[in-house]
UniProtKB/Swiss-Prot annotation:
UniProtKB keywords: Acetylation, Hydrolase, Magnesium, Manganese, Metal-binding
Annotated GO MF terms: ADP-ribose diphosphatase activity; metal ion binding
Residues annotated to bind substrate: 46, 64-65, 69, 103, 117, 152
Gene Ontology CC entries for this record: cytoplasm; cytosol; mitochondrion; nucleus
Residue stretches making up the Nudix hydrolase domain: 75-214
Protein encoded by which gene: YSA1
Source species: Saccharomyces cerevisiae (strain ATCC 204508 / S288c)
Name recorded for this polypeptide: ADP-ribose pyrophosphatase
Keyword Transport: no
Motif window: Nudix box: 116-137
Binding-site residues for Mg(2+) 2, renumbered to this chain: 131
Name of one Pfam family that matches: NUDIX
Protein family membership: Belongs to the Nudix hydrolase family. NudF subfamily.
Entry cofactors: Mg(2+); Mn(2+)
């Protein structure tokens, strides 16, 4: 279903890009009904469990429980995170594009960057630009890509590539962005001025939102760059 992103202005004049629709609901309206243990991992579409047997540096045999992706691409990378920077040519400061999305495992609404799994036959660049278009409606240009990073290596083998994309907000195709969300996706996009990003994450945390580690790591990096005068 196609949904239009409608621009609204908050009380502090920060520019927000909210997904508005009479059909789609707000992420905050979702709630957990039940959580039950799964006895057979075959019941799970996206995730499996493994018992890993390995030898430690002293040669002792040990076991490790691990969650695993069942959808890994042939390239060995599960997905992409898209660090999206909105660029203006009228003197407005750069902004970072973020999302609000209800995540059942943490029982709350997460602050995230656009992201998604790499489809079969896709490369990282294609997947990043496709996911950006589907989730936000924007068309952008890839600036850089990170090495493959692992989200929680003590728990799971899931990994991703962090792709930095710039969106030229003066281009006609970015004036009225149209998302292409799946029926089970309820995503609200908003933007924050890049230089205010670390402070805004603190405020969102205080409001009860869950911060995705990738988002907070970027905010912390900006804060450290300022603190230690890194150029």
């Amino acid at each position: 279903m196609f949904l239009r992103n409608v621009r609204v202005i908050s009380l502090n004049s920060r520019r927000l890009f909210r997904t508005m629709s009479t059909v789609k609901g707000k992420p905050e309206d979702a709630k957990i009904i039940e959580a039950r243990h799964v006895k057979e991992t075959s019941d799970c579409k996206w995730i499996g469990l493994q018992k890993i047997i390995y030898k430690d540096p002293n040669g002792k045999e040990r076991e490790w429980d691990s969650a695993v992706r069942t959808t890994r691409s042939s390239g060995g990378v599960d997905g992409i995170g898209i660090l999206t920077i909105l660029k203006y040519k009228d003197g407005k400061p750069d902004e970072i594009l973020l999302q609000k999305q209800f995540r059942p495992p943490v029982e709350g609404v997460c602050i995230e960057m656009p992201a998604g799994l790499i489809d079969a036959g896709e490369d990282i660049d294609t997947a990043a630009l496709r996911e950006l278009k589907e989730e936000t409606g924007y068309s952008g240009k890839i600036i850089s890509k990170s090495p493959t990073v692992f989200n929680d290596p003590g728990f799971t083998n899931t990994n991703l590539c962090l792709v930095t994309v710039e969106v030229d907000m003066s281009l006609p195709e970015n004036q009225k962005p149209v998302t292409q969300l799946e029926d089970n996706e309820f995503i609200e996009c908003f933007s924050v001025e890049l230089h205010k990003f670390p402070d805004e994450m603190v405020k969102l945390d205080q409001q009860g939102y869950k911060l995705d580690a990738r988002v907070q790591n970027v905010a912390q990096g900006i804060l450290m760059a300022k603190q230690y005068h890194i150029k």
